[in-house]
Amino acid sequence: MLDEFLKRPHQEIREVGGQFGDEFIPLADLTHLPTRCKFMGFMPQWDFLDFFAEQGKKYPQFHLLMEAEVTDLIVAGNTVAGVQANTPSGEIEVRATLTVGCDGRSSTVRERAGLQVESFGAPIDVLWFRISRQPSDPGQVLGRFNPGKILVMLNRDEYWQCAFVIRKGAFEQIKQRGIEVFRHDILSIAPFLKERAQEITDWEQIKLLTVLVDHLRKWYRPGLLCIGDAAHAMSPVGGVGINLAIQDAVATANILAHPLSENYVSLNHLQKVQWRREFPTKVTQWGQVQVQERILSAVLGSQGQVKPPWFLRLFKKFPVLRRIPARLIGIGVRPEHVKTHSIS
């Protein structure tokens, strides 16, 4: 499956660093990961999801409903028995022994289930936009840090996927300053973009990501389990949200495959999934909160010259240290491995 997956459009990044004013700090070296692919892959979400939809068609039990939006849960007594959903042809009901909510940070499933959320807040939001890329552009630098400004640029081959980090709730104020001032802010931190900043002509081209860091106190109730961002909204720091979501899914399959084959899933089974995945979730979120508070907030509040924190300079002096964040980004706190057999 991996070979087929890598045929899809993607970019491979083997080293990650940050530009703090005039100083470049290498932060992560993924070439030493104990994995077959010693890189971090970036793939457009459509290609990523389409690949797995195609793989699912190999299994006769797999059925994918496109353009189906969950609107409510079907509840029998205290047990979730399925979902109601809107489709182009009308409302439908889908009933199941177990409903798995994996519908993201604004999860309808977890909201309808009444599951309690513990939120840690976040001092930042992110503005996403695209700017065309030229072969003469500098290589991949994950983050650029200037006084009061942070720009993350992801190489998408033909264009840069840009994330401009702002203070929480500051988007309206930025819009009031005007699009020309925003373009100037971009050029002040990435001057090589020059005329291409003019590609940003309208606020409609810029999408606001409201950053959340939270997790459910309990990921489940009878007949229902939440995983991924539905169970724990991750900060974009490190870009590891998708990794944890996939690891949640693998752990869920490993733990629940046998009970599901017998058509009986108890609360104890669902609790085992949370026990397995709660620790890596909390550790990762703690790390993200530290980066947000100690680095990102400090840069956004700075007015003088930006200098990297002293501990980041250690990564420049001792290259072996770069393997630590590489492992956290590329593998995670508790990696999961598929232990279930393929179902024909």
Regions found by a protein language model. Name each.
Residues 1-57, 77:
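Active-site-adjacent segment of FAD-dependent monooxygenases/related oxidoreductases
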Residues 102, 228-229, 247:
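Active-site flanking residues adjacent to catalytic metal/cofactor-binding acidic residues
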Residues 59-60, 77, 190, 318:
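Acidic-histidine catalytic/liganding microenvironments
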Residues 150, 211-216, 231-243, 279, ...:
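Glycine-rich phosphate/pyrophosphate-binding beta-alpha loops
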Residues 254-344:
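C-terminal helical "tail/cap" subdomain of flavin- and related membrane-associated enzymes
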Residues 56-71:
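A conserved beta-strand/loop element that lines the FAD pocket in flavoprotein oxidoreductases
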Residues 68-71, 78-93, 98-207, 211, ...:
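Conserved FAD-binding catalytic core of PHBH/FMO-like flavoproteins
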Residues 209-226, 282-283, 300:
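FAD-binding beta-loop-beta segment adjacent to the flavin cofactor pocket
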